[in-house]
Swiss-Prot record:
Its EC number is 4.2.1.66. The keyword Transport does not apply. Coiled coil: none annotated. Catalyzes the hydration of cyanide to formamide. Degradation of cyanide may be important for plant pathogenic fungi in infection of cyanogenic plants. HAMAP family: CN_hydrolase. This is Cyanide hydratase. It comes from Emericella nidulans (strain FGSC A4 / ATCC 38163 / CBS 112.46 / NRRL 194 / M139) (Aspergillus nidulans).
């Protein structure tokens, strides 16, 4: 299917989530979807773990300190088959907009770092999970499986893909997306401290600037613009922000309160050739970053270097992707033979259709 729309407006969220509060998180999600819809956007991109906020506290606490926060975080994470998710899908439908949404997904007793791409009809086009939680994130989240790996979907606005955080740095994930002909990418980022917090021997890769743009007087080798250049995609980089109240909610008793500004101002949008297309947001900016996308502007970049096509040698180098779900327990398919298989999307209820639109679909 060729894109129906080659030129359209898109938005990346640069805002504070509803920390530890599922209902507030959903309200803010619908608010920004409505805002993007009012501004005639066809795509809105949310940060990693937007619902119920990225648990940055796990980088700063010991085991005992983590327990109350972990319990509250689990209680306010999102079931995919839930009234809350249906309200978000209805908002996408009411605004006729594609939504890339990052959330902490509850699946039985486990949590996953999940993204879904919602269509303007409110259907789930893609459901993926971060393939490997980063470092201390494994305190909270499990890993994705084979059928939650693919990140790119053909849509009416082009081949749209999304990845979480350091997946955008993973050369194998980039190669996979490039092989699928990705045109528009959502590099979803969490809450991240700035370089002023860096202490030896912590690597520079673990601060925000290393992931949002290049340093002055240094090579443009950093994560998000590099993704745009290497894949030849429009790359939207939504980021979370935090206020003083958010700092209090994420800080255990007895710990010093940080300056929220060290975390803010990192939202970006890059052209297929790596140019930054939007002014850097102010530290106190809460809102949407907008970009006008023209899919025809991708052609010349990819004509020089299409690593999913003419500029690759699959006879020499190939990537093996196993897209099958791996279940702990499998059962026999007595009708068709072999093993009975249920996709993760089916199992968590994301293939269920929405009910007919209601008059209150757009209410925040």
């Amino acid at each position: 299917m060729s894109p129906v729309l080659k030129k359209y407006k898109a938005a990346a969220v640069n805002a504070e989530p509803g920390w530890f509060d599922l209902e507030e998180s959903v309200r803010r999600t619908i608010h920004w979807i409505n805002e993007a819809g009012r501004n005639r956007c066809k795509l809105i991109a949310f940060p990693e773990l937007w619902i119920p906020g990225y648990p940055y506290w796990m980088w700063k606490v010991n085991y005992q300190e983590s327990l109350p926060l972990l319990k509250k975080y689990r209680e306010n994470s999102l079931l995919s088959d839930s009234e809350e998710m249906r309200r978000i899908r209805e908002a996408a439908r009411a605004n006729k907009i594609y939504v890339s949404l990052g959330y902490s997904e509850v699946d039985l007793a486990s949590l996953y770092t999940t993204q879904v791409l919602i269509s303007p009809a409110g259907n789930i086009l893609n459901h993926r999970r971060k393939i490997r939680a980063t470092h201390v994130e494994r305190l909270v989240f499990g890993d994705g499986t084979g059928d939650t790996t693919e990140s790119v979907v053909q849509t009416e606005i082009g081949r749209v893909g999304h990845l979480n955080c350091w997946e955008n740095m993973n050369p194998f994930m980039k190669s996979y997306a490039a092989s699928l002909g990705e045109q528009v990418h959502v590099a979803a980022w969490p809450l991240y401290p700035g370089k002023e917090t860096l202490k030896y021997p912590d690597p520079y890769t673990n601060v925000a600037e290393a992931n949002c743009d290049a340093l002055a007087n240094e090579l443009p080798q950093l994560v998000t613009p590099a993704y745009a250049i290497e894949t030849g995609t429009y790359t939207l980089a939504p980021w979370q922000t935090i206020t003083e109240e958010g700092i209090k909610l994420n800080t255990p008793p007895g710990k010093p309160l940080e300056d929220p500004n060290i975390y803010n101002g990192h939202g970006r949008i890059f052209a297929p050739d790596g140019r930054n297309l939007v002014p850097h947001p102010a530290k106190d900016f809460q809102g949407l970053l907008y970009v006008d996308i023209d899919l025809d502007e991708i052609h010349l970049t990819k004509s020089l270097a299409d690593f999913g096509g003419h500029y690759m040698r699959p006879d020499l180098i190939r990537l093996l992707v196993d897209g099958n779900r791996k279940d702990l327990v499998v059962s026999e398919d007595r009708i068709n033979g072999g093993i009975k298989y249920t996709s993760t999307m089916d199992r968590v209820g994301l293939t269920k259709p929405l009910e007919a639109p209601k008059p209150t679909d757009q209410k925040e």
